[in-house]
Amino acid sequence: MIISPFKKQTARRYTHSVKIGSLFVGSEHSIKMQSMTTTPTSDVDATVAQICSLVEAKCDIARVTVQGVKEAQACEHIKERLLTMGLDIPLVADIHFFPQAAMHVADFVDKVRINPGNFVDKRNMFSGKTYTDKNYADSLLRLEEKFSPLVEKCKRLGKAMRIGVNHGSLSERIMQRYGDTIEGMVVSALEYIKVCENLGYRDVVFSMKSSNPKVMVAAYRQLAKDLDARGWHYPLHLGVTEAGMGMDGIIKSAVGIGTLLTEGLGDTIRCSLTGCPTEEIPVCESLLKHTTIYLNLPKQENPFALENSESFVNASKKITKTTPWGSVYGVFIKLHEHHILNTTAERLLEQLGINPTNGKKDATAPEGVVIPKSFLGTSIIEKLQKHMSVFHHHEVPCLYDYNEEIWNNEQVLSAPFVHCHATPPFIHSVRSFFSKRQCEDQPVKLVFSKDLDDEYEATVSIATEFGALLLDGLGEGVILDLPNIPLPTVREIAFGTLQSAGVRLVKTEYISCPGCGRTLFDLPEVTTRIRNKTKHLVGLKIAVMGCIVNGPGEMADADFGFVGSKTGMIDLYVKHTCVKAHIPMEDAEEELFRLLQEHGVWKDPE
């Protein structure tokens, strides 16, 4: 794993400027927000209308899917219509499998996005094919031959390009040599940029997406390191692919994108949420709001110099996760008077995820609560203590500073845990502390705390700031002080962040695409129905993908996949294998549930 090698004071990574239509991206320009249409690109009226709604939502760049020549020709009319309306928003064509479409559409759009996993090479079909050194070298020559014409055309026309690597759709050749690894993702990107460099074309943006924030963050960090080592300062487009719906999708996006933004990486961003494209923009705005703070901090020392990153990784592995509450990465919730007064013990237990009748805990029940000391000894708290740890405020120091003198304070050293208040430069200060102490013989249990009133802002802020540390294995848990947010929602934010950071698995995980012009069914509606019937299957990963073009690859490490194969038809997958094909849509959901039963993972809700 690549631990953040960037400075304690966040400075944007230097990237050269790339012109995309009428705007520029790069470190000298503001970070741009991007989204993608869900209408069929061939439906010019509908696509133009949706792009207009994106412009109204303050989207900076719009992307459309281009499956073939018909969609490429439609882009000419879409761009003309937008310009006639006075809307000069850059238009991006998304290409998979069809280089001819890329060549055709480059005449009409401002940027072409290609996927190295399927532009020239075959996508990985898990065939077991072996590539000799000669096979591999021949494939690189073929790549240069097939890719160079597009590079030369984009250079001649002044059009930009995105080399968009996706973890779930690496080519068969890359998978055979490097496996499903960060190295494979980076090599895949570098193979293509070398062709661009040789032809003197540098209007290129990179992306290294995955549906797993941990993988995504590591891939971007490694690519940035490798590019900078070569003196190549290409801009980065950040995104967690197929992040999903609602709060889960927001949290997953914030953990991945937010972490990198606080480190100074990223020149454009997109939150790939299942649903209406305009819903992605407020999440992007909130992410930029919460991470821009880190760009304005005073300069401090750099404990994360590249040459020290390996020793930090090794040190972080030595952290002994033993805690007073008997669980790794605990969740604590701060209770206020209004949580305890005017309610019953039974009702409070239910809100905290505990069945008051039999004491059975939901997977998202917190390890404990922190209460005002005056409520100790009350009947409601005594009942609560039978099911979880209860601490009062004075037992748990809250720190707003992180200097060495504080860490030698007897109250801090003797406390069951210490909650570090998340106020910038919180992320950098905690990393600096662990770096200096080398994570050895650490007597203080650090739990990260946050107090906010607004549910939306709390979700983005907590996922960003806590996720950035939890991804690297730092800290022992989180404590949330969100007095105006319902307790079940507080639990959802806390455990969603832990799961997205890859440190606890407490619920069913869904990989669902945001939809595009290739989508073959109502993604939000179908995804919601599947979620409602499977959300009790803790630990299972289910992918709901709109089409067969990207679906089988982008569902990555899902256990089961529900993928649109053609209009009105669904294919079902177990891992990467299609086990049931062309199922009528009206039968497909029940077939999925039957498949779960056949594989022994189904259980009835309790």
UniProtKB/Swiss-Prot annotation:
UniProt GO MF annotations: 4 iron, 4 sulfur cluster binding; 4-hydroxy-3-methylbut-2-en-1-yl diphosphate synthase activity (ferredoxin); 4-hydroxy-3-methylbut-2-enyl-diphosphate synthase activity (flavodoxin); iron ion binding
Gene: ispG
InterPro entries: Dihydropteroate_synth-like_sf, IspG_atypical, IspG_bac-typ, NO2/SO3_Rdtase_4Fe4S_sf
Keyword DNA repair attributed: no
HAMAP family: IspG
Gene3D superfamilies: Dihydropteroate synthase-like, Sulfite Reductase Hemoprotein, domain 1
Reactions it catalyzes: (2E)-4-hydroxy-3-methylbut-2-enyl diphosphate + oxidized [flavodoxin] + H2O + 2 H(+) = 2-C-methyl-D-erythritol 2,4-cyclic diphosphate + reduced [flavodoxin]
Cofactor(s) listed: [4Fe-4S] cluster
Note describing how the cofactor binds: Binds 1 [4Fe-4S] cluster.
Organism phylogeny: Bacteria, Pseudomonadati, Chlamydiota, Chlamydiia, Chlamydiales
GO BP terms, alphabetized: isopentenyl diphosphate biosynthetic process, methylerythritol 4-phosphate pathway; terpenoid biosynthetic process
Residues holding [4Fe-4S] cluster: 513, 516, 547, 554
Pfam families xref list: GcpE
Keywords for the protein's UniProt record, in alphabetical order: 4Fe-4S, Iron, Iron-sulfur, Isoprene biosynthesis, Metal-binding, Oxidoreductase
Protein name listed in UniProt: 4-hydroxy-3-methylbut-2-en-1-yl diphosphate synthase (flavodoxin)
Pathway: Isoprenoid biosynthesis; isopentenyl diphosphate biosynthesis via DXP pathway; isopentenyl diphosphate from 1-deoxy-D-xylulose 5-phosphate: step 5/6
Organism: Chlamydia felis (strain Fe/C-56) (Chlamydophila felis)
Taxonomic superkingdom: Bacteria
Function comment: Converts 2C-methyl-D-erythritol 2,4-cyclodiphosphate (ME-2,4cPP) into 1-hydroxy-2-methyl-2-(E)-butenyl 4-diphosphate.
EC numbers: 1.17.7.3
